[in-house]
Curated annotation (Swiss-Prot):
Negative regulator of class I heat shock genes (grpE-dnaK-dnaJ and groELS operons). Prevents heat-shock induction of these operons. Gene3D superfamilies: 3.30.450.40, Heat-inducible transcription repressor hrca homolog, domain 3, Winged helix-like DNA-binding domain superfamily/Winged helix DNA-binding domain. InterPro entries: DeoR_HTH, GAF-like_dom_sf, HrcA, HrcA_C, WH-like_DNA-bd_sf, WH_DNA-bd_sf, WHTH_transcript_rep_HrcA_IDD. The keyword Mitochondrion does not apply. It comes from the Bacteria. SUPFAM superfamilies: GAF domain-like, Winged helix' DNA-binding domain. This is Heat-inducible transcription repressor HrcA. Disulfide bonds: none annotated. GO terms for biological process: negative regulation of DNA-templated transcription. HAMAP family: HrcA (MF_00081).
Length: 337
C-alpha cells in the first residue's frame, strides 16, 4: 500500500469513527469515501494499518477503530489549522468583547469554547509574575473598615475587606490611597512585598497603623494573584460521552477536580509549529487521562498561559484545533500586549 493511500484510508476511518462512534468496516469505507479501490483492497489496507498499530478491532467486531498511534498520525498530517466560519468568528468576538474584567473574560471564554467543541474547556489565569500594579482603590465602608481593590495590568482584579485598626475619615483614606498609588503604580506584583515597607514608613505617624494594615492587605492580594489557577466549563459534556471512556470516566473527572494535574499538564505542553498542541491518550503523563486527549495553545503576553479543551480520544481534532486557536487569538487581542 502506498503511503498516500495509507493516510487516506486512515483519515477515512478516523472521520467515520468520530462521526458515528461505531467501528468502521471496509464496505462502509468504499460506500462513503471515493477511495478508488475495491472493498477487498481496502480490507488488505486495513490489515496493513492494523499490523502497524494504527487501528484495532474492539472485542469481536468486524470493524476497526483508530488507536492512539493512529490518531497521532492523523493529527500530524493536519498541515494547517482550518479557520472557523465567519459566523463562528463573529460569535466569539461578540461574546468576548462584552467582558468587563479578567474574571469575566475567562468565564466567558470557557463557556464559549465548551459550546463550540462539545468538550470540557479549560483556561489558565495569565502568569502574573510579570504583572504590574495598574490601580489601587481604598473604599471606606465603616470608620475602621476598608475595602481594598488591587487591579493588575493584566486586568485581574483582587479585593478584600480589612479592619485598619483605627478610625479613618474619607479625606485621611484618600490621602493614604494617593500615597500608595503614587509609590506602587507600575510595580511588579512579585516585588510588592519589598516595596510596601517604604510606603508605610513615608506615611504620617498618626496614620501609620492604618497604613500597615493596608499594606498587609495589599500583600495578601498580590500573593493570591500569583497563585496558579484555572477556570473550566462543560464537564456535563463528559457525561454525555461516557461510553468513550471504556475503563472509567472517574479518573478524568478527578484530574479536572485536582486542578494541579491539569495546570501542570497545560504548562508542560510545548507549542506546536501550527500554533496548537495536541496530547493524545497515553501521551498524557497522568495515567488518569490515558483515554483522553488535550488540545491547547498559549495566549496573552508571551503565550505563557494556556487555553484548551479536554475530551475523549474520539474527538473531531480539526474542528477542535480551529476553535481553540481562534478563541486564544481573540483572548490575546482583548487582554492586549
Amino acid at each position: 500500500m502506498s503511503e498516500p493511500r495509507k493516510l487516506e484510508v486512515l483519515r477515512a476511518i478516523v472521520e467515520d469513527y468520530v462521526h458515528s462512534r461505531e467501528p468502521v468496516g471496509s464496505k462502509a469505507l468504499v460506500e462513503r469515501h471515493h477511495l478508488g479501490v475495491s472493498s477487498a483492497t481496502i480490507r488488505n489496507d486495513m490489515a496493513a494499518l492494523e499490523d502497524e498499530g494504527l487501528i484495532t478491532a474492539p472485542h469481536t467486531s468486524a470493524g476497526r477503530i483508530p488507536t492512539d498511534k493512529g490518531y497521532r498520525l492523523f493529527v500530524d498530517q493536519i498541515s494547517a489549522v482550518k479557520p472557523l466560519s465567519q459566523a463562528e468568528r463573529r460569535a466569539i468576538q461578540t461574546l468576548l468583547e462584552g467582558s468587563e474584567d479578567l474574571d469575566d473574560v475567562l468565564e466567558r471564554t470557557v463557556r464559549l469554547l465548551s459550546q463550540l467543541t462539545n468538550q470540557v474547556a479549560v483556561v489558565q489565569y495569565p502568569h502574573l509574575s510579570r504583572a504590574m500594579v495598574r490601580h489601587i482603590e481604598f473604599v471606606l465602608l465603616a470608620p475602621r473598615q476598608v475595602l481594598i481593590v488591587l487591579i493588575a495590568d493584566t486586568g485581574k482584579v483582587e479585593q478584600r475587606v480589612i479592619d485598619v485598626g483605627q478610625e479613618l475619615g474619607d479625606d485621611a483614606l484618600a490621602g493614604l490611597r494617593a500615597r500608595f498609588l503614587k509609590s506602587l503604580a507600575g510595580t511588579p506584583l512579585s516585588l510588592l512585598p519589598q516595596a510596601l515597607p517604604a510606603v508605610v514608613a513615608g506615611c504620617e505617624p498618626s496614620r501609620r497603623h492604618a497604613a500597615q494594615a493596608l499594606a498587609r492587605g495589599l500583600d495578601a492580594l498580590a500573593s493570591s494573584s500569583r497563585e496558579e489557577r484555572m477556570v473550566m466549563a462543560g464537564t456535563a459534556n463528559l457525561a454525555r460521552s461516557n461510553v468513550d471512556f471504556p475503563l472509567s470516566i472517574g479518573p478524568v473527572l478527578e484530574a479536572l477536580e485536582e486542578q494541579v494535574v491539569m495546570l501542570r499538564l497545560l504548562s508542560d505542553m510545548a507549542q506546536d509549529p501550527r500554533g496548537v498542541t495536541v496530547s493524545i491518550g497515553r501521551e498524557n503523563p497522568y495515567d488518569g487521562l490515558a483515554e483522553a486527549s488535550v488540545v491547547a495553545t498559549g495566549y496573552g503576553p508571551g503565550s505563557s498561559a494556556k487555553v484548551g479543551v479536554l475530551g475523549p480520544t474520539r474527538m473531531d481534532y480539526p474542528t477542535t484545533m480551529a476553535a481553540v486557536r481562534a478563541v486564544a487569538r481573540y483572548l490575546s487581542r482583548i487582554l492586549g500586549p
